[in-house]
């Protein structure tokens, strides 16, 4: 009994194994300065995106006097802010979406298999940690990494699966998808 407590709390397993399900990407690190009486005091701000590559993703911001501490704080913040995004076939979006934050706007389009991630900078980190394999994305306006990540999350927040749309409209998923194809329900059923 006492041996179980020493190894990490019984059935939970060691902390490293629990956290290994997440992939984290450092999006941006910024050196900031605070002016004090004796001069300038420097610190660092980090922006981290974390995800399980299966539809859960989050971002966090951390500030500290040293870079590793700022990254650790940002990672912890990202783990607290995880959101689930429905994916089509586990590889792309269900439909085209747009998001905005401040002066930054992003447009995300679903793509056929084999397209890859066509996105720049901070958006690519979000898609890689989310588990999206095929997407076309365009950012317009602000190129600030914080605005781009928040605009991408705003767009992903509006992503709906066919199941949730069908439930909202009191329809069956097959009826909804047959309308999308053009009324030919046999094509969808095959």
From Swiss-Prot:
Gene3D superfamilies listed in its UniProt record: 3.30.160.20, 3.30.230.10
A single MF term (Gene Ontology): structural constituent of ribosome
GO cellular component: small ribosomal subunit
InterPro entries (alphabetical): Ribosomal_Su5_D2-typ_SF, Ribosomal_uS5, Ribosomal_uS5_bac-type, Ribosomal_uS5_C, Ribosomal_uS5_N, Ribosomal_uS5_N_CS, Ribsml_uS5_D2-typ_fold_subgr
GO BP field: translation
Known role: With S4 and S12 plays an important role in translational accuracy. Located at the back of the 30S subunit body where it stabilizes the conformation of the head with respect to the body.
UniProt domain comment: The N-terminal domain interacts with the head of the 30S subunit; the C-terminal domain interacts with the body and contacts protein S4. The interaction surface between S4 and S5 is involved in control of translational fidelity.
Similarity-based family: Belongs to the universal ribosomal protein uS5 family.
Protein name per the record: Small ribosomal subunit protein uS5
Organism: Rhodopseudomonas palustris (strain BisB18)
């Amino acid at each position: 009994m006492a041996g179980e407590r020493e190894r990490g709390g019984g059935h939970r397993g060691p902390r490293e194994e629990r956290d290994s399900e997440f992939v984290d990407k450092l999006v941006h690190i910024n050196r900031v300065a605070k002016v004090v009486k004796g001069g300038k005091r420097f610190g660092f701000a980090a922006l981290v995106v974390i995800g399980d590559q299966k539809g859960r993703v989050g971002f966090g911001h951390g500030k500290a006097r040293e870079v590793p501490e700022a990254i650790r704080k940002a990672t912890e913040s990202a783990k607290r802010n995880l959101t689930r995004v429905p994916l089509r076939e586990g590889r792309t979006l269900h439909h085209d979406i747009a998001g905005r934050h401040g002066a930054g706007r992003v447009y995300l389009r679903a793509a056929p298999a084999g397209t890859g991630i066509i996105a720049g900078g901070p958006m690519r980190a979000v898609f890689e940690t989310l588990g999206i394999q095929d997407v076309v994305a365009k950012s317009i306006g602000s190129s600030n990494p914080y605005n781009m990540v928040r605009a991408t999350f705003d767009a992903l927040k509006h992503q709906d699966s066919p199941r949730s749309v069908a439930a909202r409209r009191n329809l069956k998923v097959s009826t909804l998808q047959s309308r999308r194809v053009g009324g030919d329900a046999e094509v969808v059923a095959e």
